[in-house]
Amino acid sequence: MKTFDDLFAELSEKAATRPEGSGTVRELDAGVHSIGKKIVEEAAEVWMAAEHESDEAFAEEASQLIYHLQVMMLAKGLTLADVYRHL
């Protein structure tokens, strides 16, 4: 099972090595505005899943939101420590 830290390490590696065909690289190249729109979309899907779908569907949507938040962190040049300071 992948953890929050594992995911960030994986995404950081993709951002650094830029493998061909990577969705993460494509999203980073699209920029902060595009990533932000995706975060808003995913947040709405999390909410709707919480209200109207199974716990499994909610967990899947939450994982997608976490992914896009971490991509935004990379796009902004932030680390996990930058965010953890505010928890």
From Swiss-Prot:
Protein localization: Cytoplasm
Family the entry assigns: Belongs to the PRA-PH family.
Enzyme category, top tier: hydrolase
Reaction equation(s) it catalyzes: 1-(5-phospho-beta-D-ribosyl)-ATP + H2O = 1-(5-phospho-beta-D-ribosyl)-5'-AMP + diphosphate + H(+)
Signal peptide as annotated in the record: none
SUPFAM superfamilies: all-alpha NTP pyrophosphatases
Database matches in InterPro entries: HisE, PRib-ATP_PPHydrolase-like
Gene3D superfamilies xrefs: MazG-like
Stored PANTHER family: HISTIDINE BIOSYNTHESIS BIFUNCTIONAL PROTEIN, HISTIDINE BIOSYNTHESIS BIFUNCTIONAL PROTEIN HIS7
EC number per UniProt: 3.6.1.31
Pathway per the UniProt entry: Amino-acid biosynthesis; L-histidine biosynthesis; L-histidine from 5-phospho-alpha-D-ribose 1-diphosphate: step 2/9
Keywords for this protein: Amino-acid biosynthesis, ATP-binding, Cytoplasm, Histidine biosynthesis, Hydrolase, Nucleotide-binding
Name of protein: Phosphoribosyl-ATP pyrophosphatase
Residue ranges that the Swiss-Prot or TrEMBL entry lists as coiled coil: none
One Pfam family in the UniProt entry: PRA-PH
